[in-house]
Amino acid sequence: MLNFKTLQAIDFQNKTVVLRSDFNVPMINGVISDSERILAGLDTIKFLVKKNCKIVLLSHLSRIKSLEDKLNNKKSLKPVAELLQQLLPTVKVQFSCKNTGAEVKQKVQALAFGEILLLENTRYCDVNDKGEIVKLESKNDPELAKFWASLGEIFVNDAFGTAHRKHASNAGIAKYVAKSCIGFLMEKELKNLSYLIQSPQKPFVVVLGGAKVSDKLKVVENLLKLADNILIGGGMVNTFLKAKGKATANSLVEKELIDVAKQILDKDTHNKIVLAIDQVMGSEFKDQTGITLDVSDKIQEQYQSYMSLDVGSKTIALFESYLKTAKTIFWNGPLGVFEFTNFAKGTSKIGEIIAKNKTAFSVIGGGDSAAAVKQMQLSDQFSFISTGGGASLALIGGEELVGISDIQKNS
């Protein structure tokens, strides 16, 4: 897993470097609301500054679906450049409102060694100036990849969050440069997540939540071979409950995946999969007082229109019985709608239970579970928190990380 070239394997002194980082951070009215991903990528940037490199920085931010998305500047990386300047006060950080063309080339040439130029959101290339959706970045357009590759002598990919996507700014550039490697963050992510699928200390217990089972089917299948137990809650548990013939009322069920869920449960001959046994139900999708019902074959008439929005206290106790003795824990996805106070208990209790187990190597697979743990102020109680939700699931699901597969390997 870690046979990629790393920063230490290449001479960076006075070189021009194209660095793909992951600055896909949440913004509210043009203000960064969580800078975790930017902070996580700083070590690589500082290393390259120390080597007196010219650094051409690339990142995407959100999805660009229309010309309006480009013109209203709500998805511009300018606030990221401003924050980088604050975080690196002794380094000159410039921002280019363009990411292709002669003007960009000139700016790179004019850049002094030890300085940084952040180009505009790579996904701006997904919509052209006529408003047509062309997806040059997202579909790995070779001409775009060649242009970005031409801006430097060495390519460093430190964007773990997009490691499972084959885009022009990651997989594409790696094809057209003479030298490439992974950055410190990518190295750390691969090392910690690889441990889970290569040599986890037993018992290895996995907690899966979140709304959809479709995102996690491969993960469940792959983990059946590796984990001792897979504890399932959140919205995704309903598809499995339905597959077992349980009543799910008006809860989210992915009907087209019921048969697949049934096949997975049939494969689970060692009863590794543990499903929620009670749920907190709400009459509609809003923050309200819920009612706790045991999972059963039938639901009383008056609750037929209710939906599950959290796991109940019996499920929390059941999950705790597995988690307190675990030596390795992987958690991806909240166990309820933790944004609603009345349905946050399952997620917060499971977070506390994992944090309390000081002998376990505990990993959070990015995304909403990382946000939940941050909200609970428990982030420092976990061994590792991944910056990539989808990428961590892809890796643990046994998929090839296509965004980094063309990075140079150690010979």
Swiss-Prot record:
This entry's Enzyme Commission designation comes to: 2.7.2.3
Q: What happens when the gene is disrupted?
A: Probably essential, it was not disrupted in a global transposon mutagenesis study.
Q: Which SUPFAM superfamilies match?
A: Phosphoglycerate kinase
Q: In which pathway does it act?
A: Carbohydrate degradation; glycolysis; pyruvate from D-glyceraldehyde 3-phosphate: step 2/5
Provide the residue positions that the database annotates as binding ATP.
216, 339, 366-369
Listed under GO biological process in this entry are:
gluconeogenesis; glycolytic process
Residues annotated to bind substrate = 22-24, 37, 60-63, 123, 165
Provide a GO CC annotation, any one: cytosol
Q: Name one GO molecular function term.
A: phosphoglycerate kinase activity
Q: Which InterPro entries match?
A: Phosphoglycerate_kinase, Phosphoglycerate_kinase_CS, Phosphoglycerate_kinase_N, Phosphoglycerate_kinase_sf
Keyword vocabulary terms for this entry: ATP-binding, Cytoplasm, Glycolysis, Kinase, Nucleotide-binding, Transferase
Where in or outside the cell?
Answer: Cytoplasm
Catalytic reaction list: (2R)-3-phosphoglycerate + ATP = (2R)-3-phospho-glyceroyl phosphate + ADP
PANTHER family associated with the record: PHOSPHOGLYCERATE KINASE, PHOSPHOGLYCERATE KINASE 1, CHLOROPLASTIC-RELATED
Report the sequence similarity comment from the record. Belongs to the phosphoglycerate kinase family.
Subunit info here reads: Monomer.
Q: What is this protein called?
A: Phosphoglycerate kinase
Organism of this sequence: Mycoplasma genitalium (strain ATCC 33530 / DSM 19775 / NCTC 10195 / G37)
Q: Which gene encodes it?
A: pgk
